[in-house]
Amino acid sequence: MEAYKKEFIEFMVDCQVLKFGDFVTKSGRKTPFFVNTGFYRTGAQLRRLGQYYAEAINNKFGLGFDVLFGPAYKGIPLSVAATIAISEKYGQDIRYCSNRKEVKDHGDKGILLGSPINDGDKVVIIEDVTTAGTSIEETLPIIKAQGDVNPIGLVVSVDRMERGKGTKLSLIHI
């Protein structure tokens, strides 16, 4: 395991984002740990979180993409923190985008926040926790509805590696 991943786990514990005990996930499964990224509450924590994500994104995808998409709600601050960190650390000005849970019917209207997603854009999705892959399955149609775009991958802080439909891991299923 890379050093930054070990440091990230310690960071989650220090921020009380990662807790150990007896919990039940949204999918109804019992688990000995729980992750709540809503416990990142300060500017310093979000800056450091963005740096971890920036390193993971660069290691996995490089910087050859256009938009970092954070699904509502918890993906919104993740996408903002990571794009700031990418700009500071790598000098790349990546755009961020996220969605609203409900379409706005006044003002600027629409479902997207941040940058629009344009034809030809390569998009990386950023998430906090993946259990069954449900939020990603909901996110892909939103991204693809924006035009001829290419979702190239996903970066997630915690993949519970639970099984999806059949015997496939949830992220492989997607």
Per-range role (PLM):
Residues 1-126, 131-172:
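PRPP-associated nucleotide enzymes
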